[in-house]
Amino acid sequence: MRGLFTSAGLCALAALGLAWPTCASAQVDDVLGPQAFDGTIDLRASVAGGETSWLDGGFGKLRYGGNAGDSEAHAQVASADIAWKPQFSFALSGLVSVTHQAGQSTGVDLNEAFLSYRSGPAPTRFSARAGVLWPPISEEHAGSTWQVTDTITPSAVNSWVGEEVKVLAFEGKVEHRFADQTLALTGAVFKHDDMAGTLLTYRGWALHDVRMTVWGHFPLPQLSASVSPYQAPITNPFWERDGRAGYYARIDWQTPGPVSVNLFRYDNRGDRVSTYQMQTPWRTRFWNAGAMAALGARTVAKAQVLWGNTLVGPDTPYGIPADVDFAAAYLLLSRELGGGKVTARGDWFKVHDNSFVASDNNNEHGWATTLAYKHPLTHFADAIVELLHVESNRPARVTLGAIAAEQNQTQLQTSLRLGF
């Protein structure tokens, strides 16, 4: 953990150094007034069937699951978030957000904390972020507390981004606006994402809205006899163990029409062998392609495709201990209806295990469908109803969980999302 405090401390000192000259001239209300704070409380009720949720140590794909084949009902404060977003000047601002999530391993934990810079209005603009942040991947999250915008549960793609792809980064972006279109390039170097790939390999894909935190950890399902002597039963996604910096890059194109597309590349450059407390850095690389289009005045389409590879362990004559290719995609349609918004989404996901399948089979494939309706009750409250069904095949369920490889789950949720 020393690496976390050292890196975070250096980042905080750098941020304060940049912000200090402008703090004195900033309006107090812009830094400490009501407009400098945001908050969200999510009151949740749900009914779910099928296998035990992965959050409770099973192989279930959803936030909630059944119990011994029976459906279970839940009512809880699913999350409570507070964000401080000081505006030091036109060019310089910040964001610090903390969260409490039901079942979170730490009571209250850090969500994001970064300093932002933007240049003045011009055809070519520059911006930068430095601190703890999610890379610009998800088309489904927005806001100072990184909330899902159209549904309760994000896609498999962005569920994974939320649980394993948070970083401590220095990010820069250049954007040029032409007469009828915009082109932007983003690049960053980062640390503190050495464990990305652990959940994806040993649990597989999932669909849920639980986000990783700086000091938190997630449980893993039952591990095989060949893996359990070397892998802890938990994973700490934000750990930094190998001292290596990774990178990511993105290109965005806002076309002349109501369509935007982007392409993203990520490589954490993990060394695969520097084990600490039975957790080893993974070498995880992936691409993400995204698109968004307005289909008339009231309908929006979103899509993402993510594919890559993750590795852990030394080279052996028989391959690398964990070597999996992964891919997932979704298509989402959202339309304004009856004063609210109805959203339908289809998901597909797959994991292909390239090594030691006889002793540790991490193959998986599946699909999911989601239907949600979001209705504003007041300026500060939204009601959301969501029905989600997922079917998946994972052979490890038979050998490690004593259940059938093919499983399906259905989850009905209602959310009262309060903002302040």
Predicted regions, residues:
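Outer membrane beta-barrel
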Residues: 34-37, 42-50, 69-205, 252-256, ...
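Extracytoplasmic loops and strand-loop junctions of Gram-negative outer membrane beta-barrel proteins
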Residues: 62-67, 97-98, 151-156, 229-236, ...
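Short sequence motifs at beta-strands and strand-loop junctions characteristic
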Residues: 69-77, 105-109, 159-166, 239-243, ...
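Outer-membrane beta-barrel pore domains
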Residues: 114-117, 141, 258-420
